[in-house]
Amino acid sequence: MYKLVLVRHGESEWNKENLFTGWTDVKLSDKGINEALEAGLLLKQEGYSFDIAFSSLLSRANDTLNIILRELGQSYISVKKTWRLNERHYGALQGLNKSETAAKYGEGKVLIWRRSYDVPPMSLDESEDRHPIKDPRYKYIPKRELPSTECLKDTVTRVIPYWTDEIAKEVLGGKKVIVAAHGNSLRALVKYLDNLSEEDVLKLNIPTGIPLVYELDKDLNPIKHYYLGDESKIKSAMESVASQGKLK
C-alpha cells in the first residue's frame, strides 16, 4: 500500500477578501500561515515524514509547503515546482470579488464559472500586464501553453499528465510524497484518482490547509482517503468553500 498526502494552501489574502485569485501570486493571510502550521503539527503528531514534495509556481502553495516541512524538520527534502500544479486560471475574473460578481451576473452564472467542468470565464487579454506571458516565472514555458482562462477540464488536461509522468512514478518507487497545491488543481487530481463524474466534482469542496491522505493499492487505485484533524472543523471548512461566490 502507498500513501499520498495532498494539501491545499492555507488561506491567502485574496481568499480572505473573497476575490478570484487564479494565477495571481498572493501571499498567505495570517490565518493561512496558522493553517499551514497546524497542518505541519498534525502530520508530525500522526508520524508522517516525506521523501519528496511537489508544488506549483505560486507563493501561497510554496509557503504552505515550506511551513509544513519546517514543522516536520524536513526542509531539506527535494521539492519539485511546476506551473502544471498552479491554480485554475480564472481569466478576466481574477481580482474581482466573488459576491459582487454574483450580484452583477447572477449566482448561477458565477457557480458555472467557478465549478462547472467545461465552461471557462471570459479570457484575459494577452496585452494585459497580469497575463502569464508577461510573468518572468513562465518565460521558459511555450506561450501557446499559457492560458488566458481555464475551465476545470483544462486544468485536468495539464495536471494529470504531470501526475502520471512525475508524481505517480515517485509514489510507485516507494517515495513518501506530499503535494501542496490549489483548490482546483487538487480537484483535478482527486477527480482522476477517484474517477469522479463531472457532476460529482462540481460538489467537491477542498478546504484550505487540511491534509488529505490517500491510501493507494499497487496500481494506485484509492483504497480510502481521509482528512486529518477534527471532523467538525473539517466540515465547517468545506462549507466555507462551498459558500464562496454567493450573494451576502
Swiss-Prot record:
<feature type="binding site">
    <location>
        <position position="60"/>
    </location>
    <ligand>
        <name>substrate</name>
    </ligand>
</feature>
<dbReference type="InterPro" id="IPR001345">
    <property type="entry name" value="PG/BPGM_mutase_AS"/>
</dbReference>
<comment type="function">
    <text>Catalyzes the interconversion of 2-phosphoglycerate and 3-phosphoglycerate.</text>
</comment>
<dbReference type="GO" id="GO:0006096">
    <property type="term" value="P:glycolytic process"/>
</dbReference>
<feature type="binding site">
    <location>
        <begin position="87"/>
        <end position="90"/>
    </location>
    <ligand>
        <name>substrate</name>
    </ligand>
</feature>
<feature type="binding site">
    <location>
        <begin position="21"/>
        <end position="22"/>
    </location>
    <ligand>
        <name>substrate</name>
    </ligand>
</feature>
<dbReference type="GO" id="GO:0006094">
    <property type="term" value="P:gluconeogenesis"/>
</dbReference>
<keyword id="KW-0324">Glycolysis</keyword>
<protein>
    <recommendedName>
        <fullName>2,3-bisphosphoglycerate-dependent phosphoglycerate mutase</fullName>
        <ecNumber>5.4.2.11</ecNumber>
    </recommendedName>
</protein>
<dbReference type="GO" id="GO:0004619">
    <property type="term" value="F:phosphoglycerate mutase activity"/>
</dbReference>
<feature type="binding site">
    <location>
        <position position="98"/>
    </location>
    <ligand>
        <name>substrate</name>
    </ligand>
</feature>
<comment type="similarity">
    <text>Belongs to the phosphoglycerate mutase family. BPG-dependent PGAM subfamily.</text>
</comment>
<feature type="active site" description="Proton donor/acceptor">
    <location>
        <position position="87"/>
    </location>
</feature>
<feature type="active site" description="Tele-phosphohistidine intermediate">
    <location>
        <position position="9"/>
    </location>
</feature>
<dbReference type="InterPro" id="IPR029033">
    <property type="entry name" value="His_PPase_superfam"/>
</dbReference>
<dbReference type="InterPro" id="IPR005952">
    <property type="entry name" value="Phosphogly_mut1"/>
</dbReference>
<dbReference type="InterPro" id="IPR013078">
    <property type="entry name" value="His_Pase_superF_clade-1"/>
</dbReference>
<keyword id="KW-0312">Gluconeogenesis</keyword>
<feature type="site" description="Transition state stabilizer">
    <location>
        <position position="182"/>
    </location>
</feature>
<comment type="pathway">
    <text>Carbohydrate degradation; glycolysis; pyruvate from D-glyceraldehyde 3-phosphate: step 3/5.</text>
</comment>
<feature type="binding site">
    <location>
        <begin position="114"/>
        <end position="115"/>
    </location>
    <ligand>
        <name>substrate</name>
    </ligand>
</feature>
<feature type="binding site">
    <location>
        <begin position="183"/>
        <end position="184"/>
    </location>
    <ligand>
        <name>substrate</name>
    </ligand>
</feature>
<feature type="binding site">
    <location>
        <begin position="8"/>
        <end position="15"/>
    </location>
    <ligand>
        <name>substrate</name>
    </ligand>
</feature>
<dbReference type="Pfam" id="PF00300">
    <property type="entry name" value="His_Phos_1"/>
</dbReference>
<keyword id="KW-0413">Isomerase</keyword>
